[in-house]
Amino acid sequence: MGSSYGRGRLHLAAAIDQRVEGGAEVCVELARLAERGALDFVTVGDAFTRPGPDALAVSAQVAPETGRVGLVPVVTATPDEPCRVRAAVATLDRVSRGRAGWWLGTPGPEEGAVQVRARHVGSVGAGDAGGAWHPARQASAGTRPQHGHPVRVVDATEGESRGAAAHCADVALLRVADPDHADAVRTELRDGAAGVGRDPDELRVLVSLRVDLGGGEYAAEPGHGGGGPRRTADGPLYRGGPVALAELIADWHRAGATDGFHLVPVEPRRDLERLVNGTVALLQHRGLFRTFYPGSTLREHLGLGPAQRHIVTGGGV
C-alpha cells in the first residue's frame, strides 16, 4: 500500500442524519458540535428528516445557526425537477455564504453513473463542458451560487458510480473496510479524473465509516480496529473507543489510502460528542488535524480551488 499520489492534509466530516428525535433543532445542535471540532462538513440525509422537512430544508435551517462548517444535504432529483433542485442548492450556498455542497443521490438502484451525471449535473454535456450553472435555466440571478457551483459529493463505492465521480465529483465517498481497498479505489478515481482532463488534486476521496463509540475510551473491539473495521450489511463499522479510532484514522491517512473520513455516528448525540471531544481532539493535539477554520467556504476547508469550468464530458452526456 502507498498511493503514488501521496497525501495532503487530513479531512474529516460527519453525518448528522441518523434517526433521532427532535427534528431540525437536533440537527442544528449536532452541526454546531461538528463546527466546534472544525470538521470540514456535515451531511444531512433523508433518514434524519422523515417524516419532516427534506434534507435541503433542514440544511437551510442550520445555515444561519452556524458560521463555518460545510452543509451537504443528500439531494435526489427525479427527471422532471433538476432545475428546482439546482436552484434550491444554489440558494443554500448563497445563504450559507459558500458553505453548501450536494450529495448527488439517485432515484433508485437502477440508475447508473451516466444517468447520475446527466441528471444531477444537468448542465454538463448540455453545451457547457464545465458543469457551471446556466443563467438561462435558473429562475433568477439571485438563485445562482456565488462560488461557481457548490461542492459535489458522490458515493463511489460501487464500480459503476466511479466514472461519474471521476467526471464531476469534488468529494468521493467510499464505504470500504480496509486501507488497501481504499488506496486502490482512490488511485482509480484520481487516474480517472486525470483521464478526463481534471487535476486529480482537485478530488478528495474520503472513507465513509459507521462508528459506535459506546465501548470505552481506548481499544477497538475485536475485528473493528487494526487493519480495518468490520464489514456489515449497512457498511463498514468501527466499534470501540475514540483513541483507537484516532489511531485508525491517522494510520490510513499516513499510508496515503485516503484523504480523510466521513464518519457516521450510530448514536448521533453520544458518538458525535465522543468523536469531537475525543478522536478529533487527539488528532488536533498531535498536529494531524486543524484546530480552527483558516477559510470561510467549504471549498476552502477542503483545500479546493475555485469551481472550474473545464470538466470533460463523454458518452453523449
PLM feature segments, named:
Residues 2-3, 10, 81-168, 201, ...:
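Internal, glycine-rich beta/alpha segment that forms the wall or movable "lid"
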Residues 110-122, 182-193, 268-289:
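C-terminal helical cap(s) of enzyme catalytic domains, especially alpha/beta-barrels
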